C-alpha cells in the first residue's frame, strides 16, 4: 500500500512521461525542412489556382491582392484544421505556417492572375 504522497509522485511522473512522449524535446532539422517544403509545395499550386480564378473573374488592383490574402488564409486554416491542432509535433513554432510563407505563393499568383486577366478581359 502506498502513502498518498507517494501516489501523487507516481501520478506526476506518469503525467510527465506522457507529456514527454507527446511534445518532442528537440527537432531534427531535416524533418523541419521537409515539413516546410511540404507546406510550400501545397501552397504554390493553391496560389496558381487562386490567381487563375482571380484572372477569370476579373479582379483588378487591390481586389486581386485581397483575394490572394483570402486564398492564403483559407489554405492556412484548412491545413491547420487537417492537422487537428497537432502542429507543435511537426513545427517548432506552429505560427510559422501562417507567417513564414506568405510571400512564397505571391509571384505565381500574380503571374497567373495577370496572364488570365489579360487573355480573357483585354484581348
Swiss-Prot record:
It comes from Dictyostelium discoideum. Disulfide bonds: none annotated. One of its GO terms (cellular component) is endoplasmic reticulum membrane. InterPro entries: Emc6 (IPR008504), EMC6-like (IPR029008). This is ER membrane protein complex subunit 6. It is a multi-pass membrane protein. It comes from the Eukaryota. Keywords: Endoplasmic reticulum, Membrane, Transmembrane, Transmembrane helix. Belongs to the EMC6 family. The chain crosses the membrane at residues 42-57, 64-84, 103-119. Residues 58-63, 120-123 are lumenal. Residues 1-41, 85-102 are cytoplasmic. Signal peptide: none annotated. It holds the Pfam family EMC6. Component of the ER membrane protein complex (EMC). One of its GO terms (biological process) is tail-anchored membrane protein insertion into ER membrane. It is found in: Endoplasmic reticulum membrane. Part of the endoplasmic reticulum membrane protein complex (EMC) that enables the energy-independent insertion into endoplasmic reticulum membranes of newly synthesized membrane proteins. Preferentially accommodates proteins with transmembrane domains that are weakly hydrophobic or contain destabilizing features such as charged and aromatic residues. Involved in the cotranslational insertion of multi-pass membrane proteins in which stop-transfer membrane-anchor sequences become ER membrane spanning helices.
Amino acid at each position: 500500500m502506498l502513502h498518498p504522497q507517494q501516489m501523487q509522485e507516481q501520478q506526476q511522473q506518469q503525467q510527465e512521461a506522457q507529456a514527454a512522449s507527446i511534445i518532442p524535446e528537440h527537432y531534427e532539422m531535416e524533418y523541419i525542412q521537409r515539413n516546410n517544403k511540404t507546406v510550400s509545395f501545397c501552397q504554390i499550386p493553391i496560389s496558381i489556382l487562386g490567381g487563375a480564378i482571380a484572372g477569370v473573374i476579373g479582379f483588378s488592383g487591390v481586389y486581386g491582392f485581397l483575394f490572394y490574402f483570402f486564398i492564403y488564409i483559407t489554405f492556412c486554416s484548412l491545413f491547420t484544421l487537417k492537422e487537428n491542432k497537432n502542429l507543435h509535433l511537426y513545427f517548432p513554432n506552429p505560427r510559422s505556417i501562417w507567417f513564414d510563407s506568405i510571400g512564397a505563393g505571391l509571384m505565381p499568383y500574380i503571374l497567373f492572375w495577370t496572364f488570365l486577366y489579360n487573355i480573357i478581359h483585354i484581348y
